[in-house]
Amino acid sequence: MLLLPGSHVKIVREVNKVPNIKSAMKRVELTRIRTLRNKAIKSSVKTAIKKFRTALEQGDNHNAAVNLRQAIRAIDKAVTKGVLHPNTAARKKSSLQRYFNKTTA
């Protein structure tokens, strides 16, 4: 932290601290790897949902039904990998199914 003379403004500098302890270094590396994996899984879920929504908005009910199953499968996989909480997954699946039912009815 740096305090400029004659002012009350503090400038905080962020410093990437690298741990010295071997186990802490390993935890940092594992966190980085898991973050990348979680991002990839979340991205696949979002992509599946977008495919479903675009198919439904184009009026292709058959393709939308196929994409709905794929989106639900991607959401369930994210739950088994520990990326999404089960309640979050249930909420997403429910909203997708309601949207499908409302649009195709």
From Swiss-Prot:
<comment type="similarity">
    <text>Belongs to the bacterial ribosomal protein bS20 family.</text>
</comment>
<comment type="function">
    <text>Binds directly to 16S ribosomal RNA.</text>
</comment>
<dbReference type="GO" id="GO:0006412">
    <property type="term" value="P:translation"/>
</dbReference>
<dbReference type="GO" id="GO:0070181">
    <property type="term" value="F:small ribosomal subunit rRNA binding"/>
</dbReference>
<dbReference type="Pfam" id="PF01649">
    <property type="entry name" value="Ribosomal_S20p"/>
</dbReference>
<dbReference type="InterPro" id="IPR002583">
    <property type="entry name" value="Ribosomal_bS20"/>
</dbReference>
<dbReference type="GO" id="GO:0003735">
    <property type="term" value="F:structural constituent of ribosome"/>
</dbReference>
<dbReference type="GO" id="GO:0015935">
    <property type="term" value="C:small ribosomal subunit"/>
</dbReference>
<keyword id="KW-0687">Ribonucleoprotein</keyword>
<keyword id="KW-0689">Ribosomal protein</keyword>
<keyword id="KW-0699">rRNA-binding</keyword>
<protein>
    <recommendedName>
        <fullName>Small ribosomal subunit protein bS20</fullName>
    </recommendedName>
</protein>
<dbReference type="GO" id="GO:0005829">
    <property type="term" value="C:cytosol"/>
</dbReference>
<dbReference type="InterPro" id="IPR036510">
    <property type="entry name" value="Ribosomal_bS20_sf"/>
</dbReference>
<keyword id="KW-0694">RNA-binding</keyword>
